[in-house]
Amino acid sequence: MFKHIIARTPARSLVDGLTSSHLGKPDYAKALEQHNAYIRALQTCDVDITLLPPDERFPDSVFVEDPVLCTSRCAIITRPGAESRRGETEIIEETVQRFYPGKVERIEAPGTVEAGDIMMVGDHFYIGESARTNAEGARQMIAILEKHGLSGSVVRLEKVLHLKTGLAYLEHNNLLAAGEFVSKPEFQDFNIIEIPEEESYAANCIWVNERVIMPAGYPRTREKIARLGYRVIEVDTSEYRKIDGGVSCMSLRF
């Protein structure tokens, strides 16, 4: 069960966030409205929420998942692969230290890691080697996890930006998977819920204390999740999709 959530209000500079999509620029007013709805959804999940203020220097700073990995035993400050995002680690560290006094580790150069590439399954962490997370970063991450009695393994990505672009672990051995992840041997022991290609964006969901928060507008995925017995909460994240963001990106859950 999660007790705490850290999130950050989007900055107006969000409209200049990094993107590989061709969906246009986000509308800030809509993005703010969508973020407010996301926070309201989290408020129904029996968690304490720390909402940090916007920081205009960092357009992508609403995506708090990437600069930190929160585990049950330590927090790890990452080193984002996107240079424009590296300062995001500095503006969140004080908050992280408050929750993990004396238990904060960090990834050092030349390693790069963005925690959107990391999926937690119990005490094991799957780490995507991607354009943003390199082999050295993954090596350091696994060494830190093992130091704290946890474990990690590497999954090589072929097409998507981050590991969790196409995967979501919903506890109880249930794994949402889209695209390249459906057939990866690393995941064949899970109960794989295959997300159809046309709804692949919906593979990025979050489990929060027996609720599943997912992007709105993907009825087939919603039905598959609901059939497993979860309470499903839909939130519109269409403005964040324009800058390669999804449901998991906007919070730290621990």
Swiss-Prot record:
Effect ascribed to mutating residue 249 to S: Abolishes enzyme activity
Entry annotation: catalytic residues: 162 (proton donor), 249 (nucleophile)
Residues that, per the record, bind Zn(2+): 162, 249
Description of pH dependence: Optimum pH is 7-8.5.
GO terms of biological process kind: arginine metabolic process; citrulline metabolic process; positive regulation of nitric oxide biosynthetic process
Signal peptide stretch: none
SUPFAM superfamilies: Pentein
Residues noted as binding substrate in the record, renumbered to the chain: 18, 60, 65-66, 85, 132, 243
E.C. number(s) listed in UniProt: 3.5.3.18
Activity regulation (UniProt): Inhibited by zinc ions. Competitively inhibited by lysine.
Keyword Nucleotidyltransferase tagged: no
Keyword Phosphoprotein in annotation: no
Catalytic activity as recorded in UniProt: N(omega),N(omega)-dimethyl-L-arginine + H2O = dimethylamine + L-citrulline; N(omega)-methyl-L-arginine + H2O = L-citrulline + methylamine
Keywords assigned by UniProt, alphabetized: Hydrolase, Metal-binding, Zinc
Gene Ontology MF term list: amino acid binding; dimethylargininase activity; metal ion binding
Oligomer and partners: Homodimer.
Family membership noted in the UniProt record: Belongs to the DDAH family.
Free-text function comment from the UniProt entry: Hydrolyzes N(G),N(G)-dimethyl-L-arginine (ADMA) and N(G)-monomethyl-L-arginine (MMA).
Name under which the protein is recorded: N(G),N(G)-dimethylarginine dimethylaminohydrolase
Provenance organism: Pseudomonas aeruginosa (strain ATCC 15692 / DSM 22644 / CIP 104116 / JCM 14847 / LMG 12228 / 1C / PRS 101 / PAO1)
Organism classification: Bacteria, Pseudomonadati, Pseudomonadota, Gammaproteobacteria, Pseudomonadales
